[in-house]
Curated annotation (Swiss-Prot):
This is Probable inactive peptidyl-prolyl cis-trans isomerase-like 6. It comes from Homo sapiens (Human). It comes from the Eukaryota. PANTHER family: PEPTIDYL-PROLYL CIS-TRANS ISOMERASE (PTHR11071), PEPTIDYL-PROLYL CIS-TRANS ISOMERASE D-RELATED (PTHR11071:SF561). Probable inactive PPIase with no peptidyl-prolyl cis-trans isomerase activity. Belongs to the cyclophilin-type PPIase family. GO terms for cellular component: cytoplasm. Pfam families: Pro_isomerase. InterPro entries: Cyclophilin-like_dom_sf, Cyclophilin-type_PPIase_dom. Residues 145-308 form the PPIase cyclophilin-type domain. Disulfide bonds: none annotated.
Amino acid sequence: MARPQPCGPPHARCGSPSLPERPLQVKVVGLFSCPNFQIAKSAAENLKNNHPSKFEDPILVPLQEFAWHQYLQEKKRELKNETWEYSSSVISFVNGQFLGDALDLQKWAHEVWDIVDIKPSALYDALTEDFSAKFLRDTKHDFVFLDICIDSSPIGRLIFELYCDVCPKTCKNFQVLCTGKAGFSQRGIRLHYKNSIFHRIVQNGWIQGGDIVYGKGDNGESIYGPTFEDENFSVPHNKRGVLGMANKGRHSNGSQFYITLQATPYLDRKFVAFGQLIEGTEVLKQLELVPTQNERPIHMCRITDSGDPYA
């Protein structure tokens, strides 16, 4: 997509006859698991390496899928018509001015700064795979998934990042309930989210599930016994997709959990948040739109499988 472009060196065609006094800085924000992010990253780094006096170090912001969609929606509201139909997995700026996607940045680097990218697409695929593995490993966090269906129709997968460095006990409970490795509790409850349901949807609030006993929303079981204590309240409920433990009062966590649909600061210091949705933007939207009666979904919203997505 052609966009008004920042000025280049004096010999380049540009709306201004001279180079800006301050160096240019390229910013790339995008979906870390997409090759286009690596293409844009390479273009930004090549600009700096080939013209070190003209460019500052680029700002590179890799994002998980859910965070990317949230970021893009915010940018669309901020930039309005300029990006309203924008659908790429990466976005680039030069000195804060919107430039475009990875190909727009690559084109600008070529036409204005004489930089040609000859890397094959297979190399970018390999770079993406290596970068993704390192990106996830460097978080030092655990990850789990829930596969969801509405009635008998599969709608996709939710993937969560668990803040096991902040809430290790709470995260272990959720992780083991996802994998089912604990087997059965002393009272014979199967400690596994598989085949459990989402029993509550609070509009503009949260969706709730995890009653692995009867699915009615009045029971549950942790891997430590019927309940366990509130570990801490370090993670705020400051955005959509926050994962937390539902309870019946202080120190009564079991297996029930919730996923916020927007910032819910009124839950802070009352419920333990311990993770964040990182993939499954459209899945959460579909769950959010299920009609309810007294906050109970009128269609069966079931977890068909759960576990470690990268095992």
